[in-house]
């Protein structure tokens, strides 16, 4: 509790000094992450891309980095590159000049009340306020060998992000999930009493199924031109690949305070987290806490 109060107080102390443009982050798995990794390889030593080991990426910095790369003399882009850059800008209009917004509008006027652009269900971009809201819907069914039961994932929810006065950013992600994972994951859940990537769960009516709620959110702001601060409850990732030995998103969400200092070719990150112990004992009691500083 004392650690949580310390993080909250530190975030509140830093907040009044926020006076620079801020940003929310690209979620893990977003297609723009692949674009960034590709352009990092193509640009080689360009310091704008020299930070791919610390995820998630800042949306504002990603858009600025891509624009910086495109403006370089002699740059060659494939049709796929151009398409992905256009999609990146369409998905992040709050960081695109207002004069360019019109070219991303939906061509069918009758759906513009909601899908004003093909990228987002509902979005508002006015002076001192941006808001983007989207549904989260996923339903998959599959089969696997040596298993008579279908595997499935049923996810419904909503995600929203925005910024206020170009100083404070916010993000939230809320979903309700029911799934029956492949057999090897079911074995992991049975042995560890934990669902990969999730926290508290309960058995679902289907044999081997699980039911869990996923709630994430954070605020972002800038202390100085070169220091970004994020405070909230979400996942963080340090390293490369789908998993990382240093810090992966395989576990549950956690309370965190993150300070990211980026200047010239240097990117220095401080991360403070409150974590929960793995615990398979049931009952009406608090789960043990542990803390990390990286």
Regions found by a protein language model. Name each.
Residues 1-24:
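Bacterial Sec-dependent N-terminal signal peptides
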Residues 23-40:
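Short N-terminal segments immediately surrounding and downstream of signal-peptide cleavage
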């Amino acid at each position: 509790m004392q650690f949580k109060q310390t993080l909250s107080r530190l975030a509140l102390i830093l907040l009044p000094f926020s006076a620079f443009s801020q940003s929310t982050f690209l979620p893990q798995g977003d297609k723009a992450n692949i674009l960034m990794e590709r352009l990092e390889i193509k640009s080689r030593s360009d310091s704008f891309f020299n930070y791919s080991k610390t995820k998630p990426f800042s949306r504002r910095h990603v858009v600025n980095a891509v624009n910086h790369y495109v403006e370089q003399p002699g740059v060659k882009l494939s049709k796929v590159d151009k398409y992905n850059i256009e999609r990146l800008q369409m998905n992040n209009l709050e960081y695109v000049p207002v004069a360019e917004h019109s070219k991303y509008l939906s061509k069918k006027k009758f759906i513009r009340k909601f899908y004003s652009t093909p990228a987002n269900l509902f979005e508002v971009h006015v002076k001192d306020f941006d808001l983007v809201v989207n549904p989260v819907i996923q339903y998959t069914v599959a089969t696997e060998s040596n298993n008579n039961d279908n595997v499935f994932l049923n996810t419904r929810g909503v995600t929203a992000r925005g910024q206020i006065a170009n100083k404070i950013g916010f993000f939230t992600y809320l979903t309700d999930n029911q799934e029956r994972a492949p057999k090897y994951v079911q074995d992991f859940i049975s042995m560890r009493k934990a669902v990969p990537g999730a926290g508290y769960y309960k058995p679902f009516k289907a044999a081997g199924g699980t039911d869990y709620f996923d709630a994430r959110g954070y605020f972002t702001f800038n202390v100085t031109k070169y220091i970004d601060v994020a405070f909230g409850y979400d996942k963080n990732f340090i390293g490369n690949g789908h998993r990382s030995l240093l810090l992966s998103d395989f576990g549950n969400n956690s309370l965190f305070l993150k300070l990211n200092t980026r200047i010239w070719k240097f990117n220095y990150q401080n991360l403070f987290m409150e974590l929960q112990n793995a615990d398979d004992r049931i009952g009406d009691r608090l789960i043990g806490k542990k803390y990390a500083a990286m």
